[in-house]
């Protein structure tokens, strides 16, 4: 333990787990497991990259800073931390086919690229990611399962995506996929409609599920006020004429539609 710890470690008598006040880094040590040790809370970073670890069992449940487990023959993220204060990185692990066990909360970015992940449906239903999300260079055919809100960049290039079904509802940074790049701050229903109408055949096919009136109606039913604001620039478009709004929002809809016409 001392060899890999920068700070102080202690055995919690209540939980039987090893807590670290500082950083733990056992990278490039040819470890096959954590030798029966079960970590609890790490105040700093936890890194176990470039080993022979086949399972994340024993990893801490809480990491205050970054968590890195890249270049290991793991099959899933089961056993990994539930809370990561910094960036979660698991890349260059060709054996990784599932994101099941991913953290529920990531303070910064979630980086899961250059693996063999086939689906993102194993991610926690209400997963929170502070900044970016990168799932590039896997074997994804859809984005179903990703968090609804990404404050930073969202990257999914180098996959087998048939469409952008399941893409985040909000992207604060740049959106990047094969054949489509949307600049920072421009991810909106207005932009997606524009691509659906005027984009290349590939781009139109990619965004089609995101502008499907049935999908949008479901989002309206879940959050009518929020969707009213998101759609204000396209409310009068023929594509959305059949959308149904709560009776109390009809006047607001007309007002926002008029504001959208004048660019407000």
Model-derived features: positions:
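Intrinsically disordered, low-complexity segments enriched in glycine/proline and serine/threonine
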Residues: 35, 60, 81, 85, ...
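Concave beta-strand-loop units of leucine-rich repeat
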Residues: 23-30, 38, 42-53, 61-74, ...
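Short, exposed beta-strand/loop patches in secreted or surface proteins that constitute
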Residues: 9-18, 39-40, 60, 81, ...
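N-terminal capping/linker segments that flank leucine-rich repeat
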Residues: 1-30, 199-264
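Canonical leucine-rich repeat
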Residues: 34, 56, 77-80, 98-102, ...
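Cross-kingdom leucine-rich repeat
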Residues: 6-12, 18, 112-119, 156
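Intrinsic disorder/low-complexity signal
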Residues: 1, 16-18, 22, 56, ...
């Amino acid at each position: 333990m001392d060899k890999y710890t920068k700070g102080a470690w202690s055995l919690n008598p209540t939980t039987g787990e090893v807590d670290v006040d500082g950083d733990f880094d056992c990278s490039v040590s040819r470890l096959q497991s954590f030798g029966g040790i079960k970590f609890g809370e790490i105040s700093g970073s936890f890194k176990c990259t470039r080993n022979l670890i086949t399972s994340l069992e024993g990893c801490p449940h809480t990491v205050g800073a970054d968590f890195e487990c890249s270049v290991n023959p793991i099959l899933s993220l089961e056993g990994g931390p539930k809370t990561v204060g910094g960036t979660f990185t698991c890349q260059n692990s060709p054996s990784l086919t599932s994101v099941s066990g991913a953290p529920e909360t990531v303070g910064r970015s979630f980086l899961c690229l250059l693996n063999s992940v086939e689906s993102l449906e194993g991610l926690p239903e209400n997963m929170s990611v502070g900044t970016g999300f990168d799932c590039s260079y896997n074997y994804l055919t859809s984005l179903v399962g990703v968090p609804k809100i990404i404050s930073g960049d969202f990257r999914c290039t180098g996959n087998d995506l048939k469409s952008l079904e399941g893409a985040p509802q909000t992207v604060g940074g740049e959106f990047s996929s094969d054949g489509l790049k949307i600049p920072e701050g421009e991810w909106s229903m207005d932009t997606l409609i524009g691509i659906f109408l005027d984009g290349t055949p590939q781009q139109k096919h990619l965004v089609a599920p995101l502008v499907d009136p049935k999908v949008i109606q479901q989002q309206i039913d879940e959050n009518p006020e929020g969707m009213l604001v998101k759609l204000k620039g396209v409310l009068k478009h023929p594509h959305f004429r059949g959308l149904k709004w709560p009776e109390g929002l009809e006047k607001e809809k007309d007002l926002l539609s008029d504001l959208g016409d004048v660019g407000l």
